[in-house]
Amino acid sequence: MTSHSGKPRKVIPITPVASEPTLKGETISSLYEAQKKIYPRSISGVFARWRWVMVVFTQLVFYGLPWLEWGQRQMVLFDLGARRFYIFSLVLYPQDFIYLTALLIISALSLFLFTAVAGRLWCGFACPQTVYTEIFMWIEHKIEGDRSARVRLDSSGWTFEKIWKKTVKQSLWVVFSVWTGFTFVGYFIPIRQLGVELMALQGGWQIFWVVFYGFATYGNAGFLREQVCKYMCPYARFQSAMFDKDTLIVTYDENRGEPRGPRIKKVDYKANGLGDCIDCTLCVQVCPVGIDIREGLQYECIGCGLCVDACNNVMDKMSYPRGLIRFSTQNGVAQGWTQSQILRRVMRPRVLIYSGVLVVLCVTMLASLISRTPLKVDIVRDRAALSRIVAGGKLENIYRLQIMNATETPQRYRIEARGLQGIAVASEPEIEIDAAQSRWVAVRLQIPYGSAAAGSHTVEFDISALAGGARLTEKSVFLVPR
């Protein structure tokens, strides 16, 4: 072959390469493959009951707390406008940000600990995405029926039955979602006040946030569901860094179950070369994320244990031992360990270190909260007049004190000073501050002229509540001119 210029063209050899064979159970999916809807089957069992226990417990706490009162206020309220967090008897201010930092550290460390011990325990039983998806699926099951009925309904035409069932289901989802959004906003705005404003169609931002969080609940729990766990949640991606071969996870005993296949109950399946797995696929049908646990550990698995319940029910019907699918460790399955041997390996150095650090942090934070003084003081020197001589032969320094009353009742405080001979408070020694308010106060300290050498001297301010209890000491500097 030649080009237009008459020179021979260079031919690039192309050698076809055969694609590598996939491993057993491995599938290749396109990035742009259409998402297939999952229809989880209902199942009964130990882990299914525990999931509902957690659903009821978490939702009783979530929906109930905003309606409980503590004195004249809401028991739990994060008042961003007033910059105060009310948690039972505690009132936290921006100055208490250290407690929020400590809480976040404790939460992260707890997640690391639970993951090291039992994998995605949080995801399977307490994560809001899991909890609300379970509630939405319960509504769907009650109206449209179990898995096979829902599949038939979705594949059928728009009959009267399909229209009314879909309408009722979507209506209940919307009502529940709006109620969830209303409750969530009620943690930041007093919920009774919020209810009155919404009934009167007042408060544009309040309505916006209720609708926003309601829509988020509706979309995540009603439609996205397992896609949040598989693609949007970062925890699924970095969990492998916290797993090891002694982490309790949902496992399939391949040595016992393979080769899988259907069989007649009373026939000796072992003589036919079969394992305990009858390949009924119930473990796949009940999975809320639609994976096949028999293909090994997958990042999509949320550790809910529903496949364990399904498999145990089948094993009971076949008169086989339970535990073909069970919570175990990779080492436990490979070595054939007993439950006690597995649990002993679970309490490994990594877990003990996490536990020790977590206990220390919790005890430290609790002790700090218990010993926390409901009084805060900041001292700023008056730079306009660092030191001056006043009538009576006194040397005077002026300070500005910001005193915060961190209680929920008005308080009267006494200001005293010590640290130098003859030092006294020349300004009003007592002030009154309203509940949960702060006040700037000008304080004049005086000493006899000549009673202290030239230079700076450390003095201490003692601020105490006349009603008793709160007392705080802060240091500052008294300047004596040369």
Residue ranges and their predicted role:
Residues 363-387:
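Hydrophobic alpha-helical transmembrane segments in integral membrane proteins
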Residues 2-260, 308, 321-359:
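Membrane-embedded alpha-helical bundles of multi-pass integral membrane proteins
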Residues 394-399, 440, 454-459:
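Short, solvent-exposed loop/turn segments enriched in Ser/Thr/Gly
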Residues 447-482:
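Terminal connector regions
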Residues 425-450:
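Intrinsically disordered, low-complexity Pro/Gly/Ser/Thr-rich segments with frequent PxxP/GP/PP motifs
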Residues 408-422:
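Short acidic, flexible loop segments centered on an aromatic residue
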Residues 403-407:
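Asparagine-centered strand-capping/turn motif at beta-strand->loop junctions
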Residues 115-130, 221-236, 267-315:
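Cysteine-centered iron-sulfur cluster-binding motifs in ferredoxin-type domains/subunits
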